[in-house]
Amino acid sequence: MSDVTATQSFYGRWARLYDWVATAPGVESWRVRAAEALALDPGDAVVEMGCGTGANFPHLRERVGPEGTVVGVDLTRGMLRRARERVERAGWENVHVVQADATRPPLPGPVDAVLATFVVGMFADPRPAVRSWVDALAPGGRVALLNAGRSERRFATPLNLAFRGFVRAVAPGKGSVSPARALERRVATARDEVRSQCPTTEFETFGLGYLGLLRGERGAGPESGPGHPTATDAVATEPTRTQ
């Protein structure tokens, strides 16, 4: 079974439970934080990659208003079914759901922002996907990645063991590599790609150090794009906040 097929099967089977967890009060606050990182204005166009059941839609729609546009992209039918139900219940005419591969999103033109929450860890190599997301941004556009990982705080050693067990339990498919290690490697690679593509980035951790939120802004002039600045330069100048 391919990684894509395994992911579709897993999340399609657990869509109802996923939606319940994704909208739990504590998790909801994480999603608000991610939406705020995009600094959306009324009328903006924002695309969510791997939108799942649409748990982020209310926060994105609230910020772009009725004159803006929200597009959710996901590959799993079960997830999208619940996302469409959420849109229909709310009566949002400017929120759209598209079944497509988030690594190759069918975007017709530049957008103001791209959001991906707990998504890049599913990609064997997230670099091409992240690069395409940044390329889809208009000058000055923002991208935000929210992901979970082991905490580096001193008290977290026993909790990290529980975290690794949780990741193994919820990982679609089974492989020889530790799911927790694979997740960490993929998330780090995705963050490095954002830093290499965006002149300005900000990173913060919260949730006892288990959650990391990276925000990147595409350059407004001809200097935007690959190679400006290098990943090393971006990391050196990146403001880092912890909570």
What are these regions (language model features)?
Residues R127-P139:
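A short glycine-rich, Lys/Arg-flanked "PGG" loop and its adjoining helix->strand segment in the class I
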Residues T103-V114:
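A short acidic, Gly/Pro-enriched loop at the edge of an enzyme's catalytic core
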Residues A113-P126:
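A short SAM/SAH-binding and catalytic strip from SAM-dependent methyltransferases
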Residues V47-M49, T53-R104:
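Class I SAM-dependent methyltransferase SAM/SAH-binding core
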